[in-house]
Amino acid sequence: MKKLIIVFVLLLSALSCFSQTEFTTCLFDTSRNRVIPLAVYQPHKVNLKTKVIIFSHGYDGNKNNKSNQTYAYLTRFLSQKGFYVISIQHELVDDPLLAMEGNFMETRMPNWERGVANILFTIQEFKKLKPQLNWNDLILIGHSNGGDMTMLFATRYPELINKAISMDHRRMIMPRIQKPLLYTLRGCDYDTDYGVLPTEKEQEQFRMKVVKLDGVTHSNMGENGTEEQHNLINQYIYGFLTWR
């Protein structure tokens, strides 16, 4: 009987580690006649101190209608750390494909602007749905093309967010501003376009952080990474989120 009680207690302890709630839902932006699918990772305890993270996935060729769920290693980890995570599905099957040539600051801008509109609408609606959350310290995170969207949002709506993190974005120039605090994790296999990343002097001036991860490629930051690589990414991102 004593052994059964111990096993039961251990099971409860294990379950408590995964006690956050995950669900999918959709918003509808009538002004753009657009559905915005979401994956939500809600921590066990939610109150006025609970910070919100808006996550934006990398480009997937409009082929995967669950791209926003392929970064669960990160979104679940952050939820377990007490953050309320909303992961946006930016690509719909009938969307125009992402430009693969030309000046990307011009040819990809319509895609990024659509992403910025998705993020802004999601923030506006969830402020109504979840007013009990901490919206004063809003955080954006994005990988690759989602990181480009994140940096464009930080450029256009800096007053709405506290921190923004890109995971190996390569095209959108990071704004040289002190608020929000900006952070980027760099893979080891691709360079960025000219001027995207701040110089060392600019990093110091604007309190921006650029961190290169040796042995972690661009695709490793998505679902193709190993558990060890994902754990490393998680720790770097969590470290920045708790940095003041």
Where would I find each of the regions flagged by the language model?
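Boundary at the C-terminal end of the N-terminal hydrophobic targeting segment
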Residues: 17-19
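C-terminal catalytic histidine-bearing segment of alpha/beta-hydrolase fold enzymes
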Residues: 207-244
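Short, proline-enriched alpha-helix->beta-strand connector loops that line the catalytic pocket
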Residues: 176-181, 205-207
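Short alpha-helix in the alpha/beta-hydrolase fold that links the catalytic acid
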Residues: 179, 190-202
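Serine-hydrolase catalytic machinery in alpha/beta-hydrolase-like enzymes
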Residues: 33-129
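Primarily recognizes the serine-hydrolase "nucleophile elbow" in alpha/beta-hydrolase
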Residues: 121-177
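Short beta-strand/loop motif that positions the catalytic acidic residue
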Residues: 183-185
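Sec-dependent N-terminal signal peptides
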Residues: 4-13
